[in-house]
């Protein structure tokens, strides 16, 4: 039995934003952030689902601006570290400066698994601002372990404090996770983390596989609230890790109460593995495409599964949300011509 410490990064107020169409209110943000902080969660991520400056026609308009969200969370967090996500090309260094001014202590710079180089400027700026900087590699199922290692080493060379391996499509199985996380752990000198999605119901199993491979940071969300079928449930992760003898510093009862009393009442729908999220994982499609796909399917009277299969076949990646409507239109035209 190990006594190793595992750092919990809760993404309810960032990845969970996808599941509520980015409509968190300031009061909800303060309540969730304050509850997580009181429960001992070390890192509390708050942003639009697509990161700083994500509120847009393409990614979905948020109820609040970034500054309002961050100020609401910062006022409620007393011990934990306010964390933000930034996708280069969406968020800029100016957005990062604003986040730091609002109290953010950590930025996770997220790029496609083959594009770590576009995050160099943002990692560098974060370090200049005195922030903890994380290299966050998305859609890691799309690259073999050696490519993931190559990109992780780039992030390390830019000054990243740890590397996060993300199964953004919820497409990986435990052996896939072990292969990628284990290879990165062996190759870099900084810690390694893992971000799971539950599209194939493997989120907690994959998180544990990551820990077995040497990861020391794990992402979770209360009630699993997140894109697609959601993330690993923070409260479940804490309980499972405790049973296995790992230290998280999180009060199990308190984090369960946050999930049940604060998060669950504001969920738009149960975070379960329905057909379309299951297809996300099966086809290897970016989890935040889900609600966009539902809307396109309704508009063109299509089965969302058909759209997702085609998106997977075309190897669409995060940032190509605008292509969902194009694909749906093409499928509808093809159907009409048959």
Curated annotation (Swiss-Prot):
The enzyme's E.C. designation: 4.1.3.39
CDD domains cross-referenced by the UniProt entry: DRE_TIM_HOA
Any single GO BP term: catabolic process
Protein name (database record): 4-hydroxy-2-oxovalerate aldolase
Signal sequence segment: none
Key word Lyase present: yes
GO molecular function, one term: 2-isopropylmalate synthase activity
Positions marked as site (Transition state stabilizer): 14
Similarity comment: Belongs to the 4-hydroxy-2-oxovalerate aldolase family.
Active site: 18 (proton acceptor)
UniProt catalytic activity: (S)-4-hydroxy-2-oxopentanoate = acetaldehyde + pyruvate
Amino-acid positions noted as binding substrate in the UniProt annotation, renumbered to this chain: 14-15, 168, 195, 286
Lineage: Bacteria, Bacillati, Bacillota, Clostridia, Moorellales
PROSITE patterns: PYR_CT
InterPro entries: 2-IPM_HCS-like, 4OH_2_O-val_aldolase, Aldolase_TIM, DmpG_comm, DRE_TIM_HOA, PYR_CT
Alphabetical UniProt keywords: Aromatic hydrocarbons catabolism, Lyase, Manganese, Metal-binding
Pyruvate carboxyltransferase domain segment(s): 6-256
Binding site for Mn(2+): 15, 195, 197
